Amino acid sequence: MRTKSPWIRGLSYHMKIYDISRDLLKALPYPGDEPPRLRAVHKMKDGESYNLSRLETSMHAGTHVDAPLHFIANGKDIASMPLTHFVGDCVVLTVPKTPLDAMYFMKRPFAPRILLHGEGQLTESAIGYLYNQGCVLIGTNKQSIGSYSDELSVHVALLGYGVAVLENLELRNVPDGRYTLYAAPLKISGAEGAPCRAILVSDEEES
């Protein structure tokens, strides 16, 4: 019987991996945005020697990261953001459909990267508190960290502090708790955001 190498066996045995990314082509586009399109340019089934596709997409389709440039004129582009924002200790919190203020987060576990599962809206006091605690990334299962009626204020507050915004996550099968997050965006110079493949890793043994 073939056995896995110790390296591969170690990865699967000691860690549980959650894919928290939505499929880029299947995720519901933000209202007003064109859906992504994947077009075959060369096809082996047509007798060519290889397959090659062309992708046309908004930088904010599917699971993606917002850089400061998205809402701040002279803010950093996605390629200039520190990779340390996207890798490291993380906590997943299920939140109620109410305004989330500083007091709410004072009573919850903290990590430099926080993923919010639910419809709650961040308040100015919460954003200031989390930044002062050392938060570098806020994520959400929603299409946007803001609300449809007020996209500007939450984005400007977070991105003004240099906090990365990770949106459109798939968190339905992820229990609340502590994880290691890996969510580096594509490196695209001059872009105000980019898609990413986000995963969470826990020390729980995978069954």
Q: Each predicted region: which residue ranges?
A:
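Active-/binding-site microenvironments in catalytic and ligand-binding cores
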Residues: 5-207
